A protein has these predicted regions:
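N-terminal organellar transit peptides
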Residues: 1-70, 77-182
């Protein structure tokens, strides 16, 4: 499966959850989700999180570029998270869309506090303790793949075969081509 783009109208949480459920009825050892998303709607995203957490088949999310905001929460709900070596992950406290993004009424502040707690509960399942995660969310923290690995937010850093090929020194390249010709 692929989760590319913003979670919301483009990546509908209900539809995505239904697709996951149909794959869960299949004969798969693992379900792989490729991700490159700036995040999006918390309510749509939590539909995907709930679907991932209720799967019988293990789920692996591969972060191909960015997993920011709600997409990061979706990613860490998986059984396994792999990030490309150049990929980034970002977590932050939720906010209202609009002019200021800030909660103004006591009711809005209470709602945002509850949403923040809900998202943090998913993140702490595999990362830092609750107090540390709250601080990282409040500060809007960006992680490189190595930093996400250190924080427990991903399990593996991957690189493409092309990157590995480009990193070979000239002697290794010569040996590679001469051994194929023999």
């Amino acid at each position: 499966m692929r989760l590319y783009g913003a979670i919301g109208p483009r990546v509908d949480g209900d539809y995505f959850a239904q697709e996951l459920a149909s794959l869960d009825r299949g004969d798969f050892d693992m379900i792989h989700i490729r991700m490159n998303s700036p995040g999006g709607n918390v309510f749509q995203g939590m539909s995907i999180v709930s679907a991932i957490l209720s799967m019988n088949t293990p789920v692996c999310v591969h972060i191909d570029g960015i997993a920011a905001s709600m997409a990061a929460v979706v990613a860490v709900a998986a059984d396994r998270v792999c990030m490309m070596d150049f990929a980034k992950m970002m977590i932050h406290d939720p906010y209202f869309t609009g002019e200021s993004g800030k909660a103004t009424s006591p009711k809005q502040k209470k709602a945002l506090a509850r949403l923040t707690d809900m998202l943090r509960q998913v993140l702490v399942r595999r990362g830092k303790d609750e107090a540390t995660m709250a601080k990282l969310m409040r500060e809007e923290t960006w992680f490189s793949a190595a930093e996400a690995l250190d924080a427990g937010l991903c399990d593996e850093i991957t690189s493409s075969a092309r990157n590995e090929f480009m990193n070979l020194d000239p002697m290794q390249l010569c040996l590679l081509y001469t051994s194929d010709a023999a």
